[in-house]
A protein has these predicted regions:
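Short acidic linear motifs
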Residues: 2-474
Length: 474
C-alpha cells in the first residue's frame, strides 16, 4: 500500500514538474517574440545620423566632450575617445586623469532662473567669482575657445550615448562667466560683458541648427533663454545709445531652422532613453504616448493631443501623471511628495534644501526640479511654473526672444506707458503663439506673458522671420 502511494506521488510530482517546465518554456517563447513593427517604427529604428563631414577640430560637441582633458592634452582627441567610450560603456565611461572644476566652499549656488536676485547674488559673491575663474583658468580658456568653433554636429547616433555624457563642467563654467559678464556690464565695462553674450548666444544657436545634436533643442533652448534672461535683467541698467544696434542684433529672431522646435520635440524619441526599449515593443512613439505614460518632458513639449486646455488639463491630471509608470525619471510617491514640499519653499530655502531632499532620488532629479521650480513666484494650484512663462523659456524660444527684444526696444526708446499700446499694434499680431500674448505693467515698466487661455493642440510655429519693429515715437 505504501509502495503504491509513493509510486502515485512520484507520478504526480513528475508530471507537475514537466507541466511547470513546459509553461516556463511557453512564457519564454511568448515573451521572446515582439510585435511586428510598423514601417514607421522600422524607419525610426534604422535611422542613422547623416554623414558628418565636420572635422573634429571644428566641432563644438567634440570640444565639449573633451573639455576636461588633462593639462596639455589634445582636447579634441580626448573628446573623440570619451564619446566612443561612452557609446560602448554608457554611464560607466570616465575620462582618465581629467581636470576638475574647483571652487571654494560653499559653492556658488546662484542660478539665472532666480530673476533679478541672480545679479544681486553675483554682486555678493563678486570676489569669489573672480578667484574661482582665475583658479580654473585652463577650463575657462577652453570654454572661451569652444565658443569660437564654427560647427555643432553629432558624430554618432545620439540615442545610445548622449544621455550618459557628462556635460556638467561646461555649464558650470558658463554660469560663472555669465555672472561675471553681467557684473562687467553693471560696472560699465560693457564691451567685455557684451562679448560674452554675443559668443555664448551664437554657440547655442549653432546647437539649434545642428542635426542629431546631443543637447538637442530643449537644452539648447534652455541655455539660449538663460542668456536672454541675463540680457533682460540688464535692461534696467543705463545703456549707451550707440550700443542699441548691438543689443538688438543679440536678440535677433531665430532662423527658420532654429524655429523648428515642435518638430524636434515631436520626433525626438531618443531624448528619453527610458522609451528606447518601449519602441521595440510598440509600433510608434505616438502609440507609446497614447497609453498616457507621459514623461515630464513630453508634458511641457506641447505634444499632448489630448490636452483640451493647458492649465485645466494639467491641474486635473498632475497627480496621475507623476504616479503612473514611466511618468517621470522618478515615478514614485516619495518623489512626488518631495516635489510638492520643494515647490512650496522660497527661493533661498529651495537652494538650501534642494540637494539634501533630492539626494535619495535618481541623477536627473535636481535638473528636473530646477526646470519645474517657479523662479518668479507665480505658482499655479499645481505648484508648477506659470505655463506661458515655461513655454517661453524652454519651448517657444523665438517668442521669448521677441518678448525680451520688445522690452529692450521700450527701454532704449524711454517710452511712456501711454505709448506702449500703439507700439504693440505695430507688431505682426498673427505671429503670436496661443500662450504668448503680452501684458504691460506700467508701474514696473515690464512686459510679460499673458496667462495661457487657448488650446495648444495643433499649433505649429511660424517659419517666417519677424520683420523689424517700427521705431517708436518719443
Amino acid at each position: 500500500m505504501l509502495r503504491r502511494m509513493l509510486r502515485l506521488l512520484w507520478k504526480v510530482c513528475k508530471w507537475t514538474l514537466l507541466v511547470a517546465v513546459a509553461l516556463m518554456a511557453l512564457v519564454v517563447v511568448i515573451n521572446w517574440r515582439d510585435e511586428p513593427l510598423s514601417d514607421e517604427a522600422r524607419a525610426l529604428l534604422a535611422e542613422q545620423p547623416p554623414a558628418n563631414h565636420v572635422p573634429d577640430r571644428e566641432n563644438i560637441l567634440v570640444a565639449m566632450a573633451g573639455i576636461k582633458a588633462p593639462e596639455g592634452a589634445d582636447v579634441f582627441e580626448a573628446g573623440r575617445r570619451y564619446m566612443e567610450q561612452t557609446a560602448r560603456q554608457g554611464e560607466s565611461a570616465e575620462q582618465e586623469q581629467k581636470l576638475t572644476w574647483k571652487e571654494t566652499e560653499p559653492p556658488f549656488d546662484c542660478t539665472i532662473s532666480m530673476g533679478d536676485d541672480f545679479l544681486q547674488c553675483a554682486e555678493l559673491e563678486r570676489g569669489r567669482l573672480a578667484e574661482t575663474l582665475a583658479f580654473n583658468k585652463t577650463l575657462v580658456a577652453r570654454y572661451r575657445a569652444m565658443q569660437r568653433l564654427p560647427h555643432y554636429a553629432a558624430i554618432q547616433d545620439p540615442g545610445t550615448w548622449v544621455v550618459d555624457m557628462d556635460f556638467g563642467t561646461p555649464f558650470t563654467i558658463r554660469k560663472f562667466l555669465l555672472a561675471q559678464a553681467m557684473l562687467d556690464i553693471k560696472d560699465g565695462n560693457t564691451d567685455a560683458g557684451l562679448e560674452f553674450f554675443k559668443k555664448d548666444m551664437a554657440l547655442w544657436r549653432k546647437n539649434l541648427d545642428g542635426k542629431f545634436c546631443l543637447l538637442d533643442s530643449m537644452f539648447a533652448t534652455a541655455w539660449l533663454m538663460q542668456d536672454a534672461r541675463g540680457v533682460s535683467m540688464l535692461l534696467s541698467l543705463p545703456t549707451k545709445g550707440e550700443q542699441q544696434q548691438e543689443w538688438r542684433a543679440l536678440l535677433a529672431p531665430l532662423s527658420p531652422g532654429q524655429q523648428s522646435l515642435h518638430a524636434a520635440w515631436e520626433g525626438e524619441i531618443k531624448f528619453n532613453h527610458n522609451y528606447a526599449p518601449e519602441l521595440k515593443r510598440w509600433k510608434s512613439y505616438h502609440e507609446v504616448s497614447s497609453r498616457g505614460d507621459y514623461n515630464i518632458c513630453d508634458i511641457f513639449s506641447g505634444t499632448m493631443e489630448k490636452c483640451p486646455a493647458w492649465q485645466a488639463w494639467l491641474e486635473e491630471n498632475i497627480q496621475s501623471i507623476f504616479l503612473q509608470p514611466n511618468a517621470s525619471f522618478n515615478d514614485n510617491i516619495p518623489f512626488y511628495k518631495t516635489w510638492l514640499k520643494l515647490t512650496d519653499l522660497s527661493w533661498k530655502d529651495y537652494l538650501a534644501q534642494r540637494d539634501v531632499m533630492l539626494a535619495p532620488f535618481k541623477k536627473p532629479a535636481k535638473l528636473q526640479m530646477d526646470w519645474i521650480y517657479n523662479p518668479v513666484g507665480k505658482k499655479s494650484s499645481t505648484h508648477l511654473m506659470a505655463p506661458a512663462e515655461y513655454i517661453g523659456r524652454l519651448h517657444d524660444a523665438d517668442t521669448y526672444l521677441r518678448l525680451i527684444r520688445l522690452q529692450l526696444e521700450l527701454r532704449l526708446a524711454e517710452m511712456l506707458s501711454g505709448q506702449v499700446a500703439d507700439f504693440l499694434k505695430q507688431l505682426d499680431a498673427p505671429y503670436c503663439a496661443p500662450c504668448s500674448d503680452f501684458s504691460w505693467d506700467a508701474q514696473t515698466r515690464q512686459l510679460s506673458f499673458h496667462p495661457c487661455s487657448e488650446q495648444l493642440a495643433g499649433w505649429v510655429p511660424p517659419s517666417a522671420t519677424l520683420p523689424e519693429p517700427a521705431a517708436p515715437a518719443h
